C-alpha cells in the first residue's frame, strides 16, 4: 500500500491564509495523493473550509492557534512574538517531533527560514541551508539552488549544494543520475572566482556516483535545460530567479499588446489561441510553485505568498513527492559519503593550496534588515 505522507500545513500563511491554503490542500487531494494533513491555525477560520471540503476534513487534524506570523514581520520579531505558538512555528515543530514528514507554508520567507533554522538546525556537515527552486526550461524542468538563502559560498558549500540538488532532482524530476553544472561566467575551466573553480575541481575528483557533474554552465543554460541541476550561491541565484520572473512577465505583456493592437492582430490571435494557451501554461509560474529549504534536519516547502489555490496545490504536491522519496534520508547518506571521500582525497583543497575559508557570518543574507 502506498505510504501516507503527513504534511504539516501552516493554514494562516501567505497573503490569503485559509482562503487559499485549504482549498489548495483539497485540490491536491483530488489528484489521488495519499496525504494526511496536520492543519495549524485559527479553528474559527479553518472549520468553514473543512465543512466545504469533506474529503480534506476526513484526512485532516486541526491544531488550534490564533497566532500567525504577518507577511511584514521581521524574522527576529517573529521569533520573539510567535516562536512557540504561531501556526508557522508549530508546523515546523511538527516535523522536528516526527509528527509530520514535511511542512508547507506560504508565509514570510525571512521568518520561515529563521524559524526553520532555529527549530530544525542544519544537518551535520552543512554550514547553511539553501533554497532550491524548480525552473521551467525548454527541455522540461531544472532544479536551481541556492536562490536566496545566503550570500557567498566556499567550495565545500557548493559541493554540498550539488549533492542536495541532485537528491531533489531524483525525487521531483524522477532522474536517476542527474546532470549537475556550476553557474559561472563562462564554460571554460579557467574562468570564474577561485571558490567556484575549486568546487569544480572537487566535484571532478570525487566523481560522486549519485550525480553526473558536467562542468560550468552559463546563465542561458538554465532556460535551455542544459543540466538537471544548476548550482550557485544565493546572491547570483536570487538575481537569476528575479530576472527570469521579470522576463516572463515582460514577454507576456509584449504578447498581450501585440495581439490586441488591431483587427488583424486579433484575428491572428483567434487562430493561434491553442498554441498560445500551451505557451501560457509553459510559462505559468504556478506550475513550479514551491521553494524547498534544503540542508536542514527536516524539509520545509515555501509556497509563494501571492499564490492562488492551484499554485498552492502544486507546492503541496511537490512536498508530497519529496517526502515519498525520503529526500532527507537520501541527502544525509549522500553527504556522509561525500565527506568520507573528501577526507580521503589528498587534493581536497582549493586551487590556491589552502582550504576554502568559511563564509563569514556577516556575508550571510540579511533578511532581518
Curated annotation (Swiss-Prot):
GO cellular component: cytoplasm
Family matches, as PANTHER family: FATTY ACID/PHOSPHOLIPID SYNTHESIS PROTEIN PLSX, PHOSPHATE ACYLTRANSFERASE
Protein name: Phosphate acyltransferase
Pathway(s) this gene product operates in, as recorded in its UniProt entry: Lipid metabolism; phospholipid metabolism
GO biological process: fatty acid biosynthetic process; phospholipid biosynthetic process
GO MF, one example: phosphate:acyl-[acyl carrier protein] acyltransferase activity
Lineage: Bacteria, Pseudomonadati, Pseudomonadota, Alphaproteobacteria, Hyphomicrobiales
Keyword Endoplasmic reticulum appears in the UniProt entry: no
UniProt function note: Catalyzes the reversible formation of acyl-phosphate (acyl-PO(4)) from acyl-[acyl-carrier-protein] (acyl-ACP). This enzyme utilizes acyl-ACP as fatty acyl donor, but not acyl-CoA.
Similarity comment: Belongs to the PlsX family.
Region (Disordered): 342-369
Name of encoding gene: plsX
One Pfam family recorded for the sequence: FA_synthesis
Key words of the record: Cytoplasm, Lipid biosynthesis, Lipid metabolism, Phospholipid biosynthesis, Phospholipid metabolism, Transferase
Assembly information from the UniProt record: Homodimer. Probably interacts with PlsY.
The reaction(s) this protein catalyses: a fatty acyl-[ACP] + phosphate = an acyl phosphate + holo-[ACP]
Documented EC number(s): 2.3.1.274
